[in-house]
Structure formats: structure tokens, C-alpha cells
Regions:
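Fungal secretory targeting signals
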Residues: 1-32
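Mature, structured extracellular domains of secreted fungal proteins
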Residues: 22-186
Length: 186
């Protein structure tokens, strides 16, 4: 019997963890067939996937983490919104819904800058990006769009883990497409 190699196991686990983005893949693949410049003016949208919220009330904080796939460029950004919590009752405190949080771009060939704003009371997410399409470095596009996130707190959906400061609670957030509006081309 052949013994599995660590690299193959890691690759298998990595690929298995990518099940979430594949649910949105048919639409994304069809749109990727069009050029970046066409999509930049017609559908400057984002696919938000693999999002989750993690609360650590006992330690006084939490965060929402998500991945934003930019449709025109096909580039992926990782975004985190950190917030403070009251250690006694777990309420979110001092959160500025207008604060912009820079995302980390897993850049390939485009110049993509993405940021998010998140209103923790309504879970309204606003995404903003500016980018240049490969092969057309003369035009810089900018777009913004908003969508409400849906946090799943149904029984069994969230993971509760004990820590030194009390329980941490991690809940999934449903995938969503954010329809972008082109703000300008310079």
C-alpha cells in the first residue's frame, strides 16, 4: 500500500477548502471570458465569499473577515474589519461605520486597490476599488458598491470555542455579489 505524501495531503486539503468559491464559479467564469476593459465599464462587481464573523467578548474584540473577488480583473483581496466589544455584555462599542479598511490584494498582474466599510449595526458592506487592466495601462477605473451581509446564527451554524477570556464565537456569513457602480475612468 502506498503511503500518502505530506505535500499531496496538504494540496488535497487546500483544494477541499475551496468549495465555497466554486459555488459562484459558473457566473464568474462566464464573466471572465469578457475582457477586463469591457467588464470594468459594464459590471465592475465583486463576489464576496468565505466570510465569517468572530467575536471574543471576554477579550474585548472581534472581526469580520471576507474575501472579495473583483470580477473585471479576476483578482482576489482579503479584507478584515476589526471592532471593539464590551467585555461585560458583548456589545460592539466605538465602531465607526464610515471607517475604510484596506484589503490585502493577492495581486497577479493588475494594479488593484480595494477597501471596505462595514456598518456593524446593519451589516451593510461597501466595497471600493480602483484598478488598471493588464495591457491598457492608460486607464485607471474606480467603482463602489454595497450589499447587506447575512450572518448565520442558526443553531449549529456557529463554532463556540473556550478561551482564557471566555467563549469565542465564529459564525459564517453567506456569499453575496456586490453590484458595483463605475465612479470614473482617468
Amino acid at each position: 500500500m502506498r503511503r500518502p505524501q505530506a505535500g499531496r495531503i496538504a494540496l488535497s486539503l487546500f483544494l477541499a477548502g475551496q468549495a465555497t468559491p466554486l459555488t459562484a464559479a459558473p457566473a464568474a467564469n462566464a464573466q471572465r471570458a469578457a475582457s477586463c476593459t469591457e467588464l470594468s465599464t459594464a459590471t465592475p462587481d465583486w463576489l464576496i465569499w468565505n466570510a465569517m464573523s468572530s467575536d471574543w467578548p471576554g477579550s474585548g474584540g472581534g472581526r469580520v473577515q471576507l474575501f472579495a473577488n473583483h470580477i473585471p480583473t479576476g483578482e482576489l483581496s482579503s479584507c478584515n474589519v476589526n471592532y471593539r466589544m464590551n467585555a461585560t455584555d458583548g456589545r460592539i462599542i466605538g465602531h465607526d461605520p464610515t471607517a475604510a479598511h484596506a484589503c490585502i490584494n493577492f495581486s497577479g498582474t493588475t494594479a488593484l486597490n480595494t477597501s471596505v466599510q462595514l456598518d456593524m449595526d446593519t451589516l451593510l458592506l461597501t466595497v471600493r476599488s480602483s484598478w488598471i487592466c493588464e495591457g491598457d495601462e492608460t486607464a485607471r477605473y474606480a467603482a463602489a458598491g454595497s450589499a447587506n451581509l447575512q450572518r448565520d446564527t442558526s443553531p449549529g451554524a456557529c463554532i463556540v470555542e473556550g478561551t482564557l477570556y471566555g467563549d469565542s464565537i465564529t459564525c459564517p456569513i453567506a456569499d453575496v455579489e456586490v453590484e458595483g457602480e463605475l465612479l470614473g475612468v482617468s
